[in-house]
Amino acid sequence: MPQLDTSTWLTMILSMFLTLFIIFQLKVSKHNFYHNPELTPTKMLKQNTPWETKWTKIYLPLLLPL
């Protein structure tokens, strides 16, 4: 059974990392970032729900007299 030649693996792995790094740098450099991000104020509208307008009384079963 022949031996596996691993002498070129280091070169291949290093070249792969270099290529991936270059591709990633090119993709990030073409991305448009916001220069000055600011929070936009949002208005919270108060909506009345039916259970807020009605008076309700909740009875727990354990509090009822026997």
Swiss-Prot record:
Q: Does the keyword Transmembrane helix apply?
A: yes
Q: Which residues carry this modification: N6-succinyllysine?
A: 54
Highest taxon of the lineage: Eukaryota
GO MF annotations in UniProt = proton-transporting ATP synthase activity, rotational mechanism
- List residues, modification N6-acetyllysine: 54, 57
Family matches, as Pfam families = ATP-synt_8
Where, by residue number, does the polypeptide cross the bilayer?
A: 8-24
The record gives the membrane topology as: Single-pass membrane protein
Query: Biological process (GO) annotations?
Result: proton motive force-driven mitochondrial ATP synthesis
Could you say which protein family the record assigns here? Belongs to the ATPase protein 8 family.
Protein name in the entry: ATP synthase F(0) complex subunit 8
Q: Which organism is it from?
A: Bos taurus
Ranked from the top, the taxonomy reads: Eukaryota, Metazoa, Chordata, Craniata, Vertebrata
